[in-house]
Amino acid sequence: MVQQQGMERINVGIFAHVDAGKTTTTEHILYESGRIKAVGSVDSGTALTDSMEVERQRGISVRAALASFEWRGVLVNLVDTPGHVDFLSEVERSLRVMDCAVLILSAVEGVQAQSEMIWNALRKLGIPTLIFLNKMDRTGADPAAVLAQARTYLSGDILPVQQALGQERNYAGAVDLWAEAADPAARTELLESLAERDEALLETYMSGAPLDLTAWKNQLKAGAAAGKWFPLVYGVAAKGLGITQLLDAMTDYFPRACGSLELPVSGIVYNIQRDKSMGRMAFVRLYQGTIRNRDTVMNYTQDVQGKVTQIRKVEGGRTEDVGALEAGDIAVVYGLSGVRIGDVLGVPDAIPQEAKLAVPLLTVRVHWDAAVDEHEVIGAFQELADEDPLLDTQWLQDERELHIKVMGPIQLEILDSVLESRYGLKVTFGQPSVIYRETPSRTGEGYVAYLMPKPCWAILRFRIEPGPPGSGLVYESLVRSSDLLPQYQNETARRVPEALMQGLYGWEVTDLKVTLTEGQHHVWHTHPLDFAVATPMAIMDGLNRVGTKLLEPILQVRIVVPEENGGRVMNDLVQMRGTFEPPVLQGERMIIEGRLPLATSLDYPVSLSSYTKGRSTFTSFFAGYEECPPDVRAERTRRGVNPLDQARYILSVRKALQG
């Protein structure tokens, strides 16, 4: 592996929509850099970054994979992320630890819905981004059309820094516009684009004086490193065309990772995996400080200390002890038992914000034969939930049922394979159900006086108000500490989110503000757990008074079909309660963008592919929750005793708290 300490570093994420050639590009990058001796293949299951057995079998990336190499004296930590929307949680976690990104677009399919979603997240986080326009040799490749599309849907500041030599079968590579061999007219177009975006460059350009191309390129480098401008390069990853130029562009236009080695440790755990012999592997991006083997590190999130046993670089199935992790670098830390994804190590000072992309929209029950040990199944899913917390594994003790949350059907297929290959367990999954939510219909109050059966005393009054869409839960207390002691207020605040997990229809209640307006305790009779019992009763009393509305998940979709199928697609969208923009014709293809309820469109991609004979693409991403029409009813069986039945609820909760 490459020498690391003291080197300049860049941490790069590779992102793409499904089938844009992302893993193939990564393999050729690793080969061109000398990191591997032969190019692996997605189809043959030999790609270095597809190290899981299921990835090799299925030919798709399931988990974000880390690889390191050196190029032009710079250490590059490259994270290859999954392209399929079902594994968006891996993309989300990778975004948080990247300093820069390569977004791969296909010169045939162009910008897809997932491309837009990833782009928006990159912009929200201010991550400098380079675009690699792949598959330039494919029939139907149209780089000019895709560039126009990218400038419309992504950014008007996408700037090609190469001139493509031909397209489709005639594609013969690309020439750097800064090189002497570049076509003067193409270079002038780049210079004019830069001048339009920078007043100082415009003055220089208009002066008529000879242009210093090195200075202009340095300005482009600065703008790209600042995330203002986005260089674009061309290539054919499957043939290795354009890979060297892509690597050069990465080291030219991307900023170096920074962070003081002397400041206190500040890092984040962005991935958890397991090693059969060494246990839990915590993938850590360190922003400042240094961690060494045998150091004791504070887990800020959990307020516990852990002893580091080893720090290793892991690539595919190969690992090497590197002894230390420095600011700006990424490595795997062993020895931190109980560490979880998202945990902050050291101090939180240098940790960047995160972008929320992945929202599980389906819930599924897990089934197994009577001969299978249920404890093994539950344990396996709990381990898998450590690696992907969005699975949200729930074991319902009374019902003897196991439920998980997933993004889509492909994820279920992968889970099935992983359970069999890693744990030797065979399970089946029930029919996926859409996860609805609830929100208050109007403003009102909830009240409880929990005074019997003694000993107990807790009085609470909440104001419940509808909030803006997507606002989640906002909680506030107006009660003075002299009326309700801080420890009781803290217990109440902690229990409010739990109380909202099941509303009047059994779904999580969201997009609301809850304000504690009154609270009382008794000097002798009150126990802190009294407020754990009282809070759900007051919340449910309030929801029962104000009523709740059902919310359903909505998808933003982009459908590309042959022109003759466009009319049927638009009719389908109407039948599914969807809306759409005026369709766009692109050659013989029709592009239709719109919004669809997930509940009505679960099976539509299969149906669409069938009647277009495989000549369609359907891409989507989660757009948010919206109010259901009045005729849509979706009620979920409540788990546990309803707090509205206060007598039974008090008895059941008291028994649970004491037991």
Locate the predicted segments by residue.
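Structural and coupling elements of P-loop NTPases
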Residues: 1-659
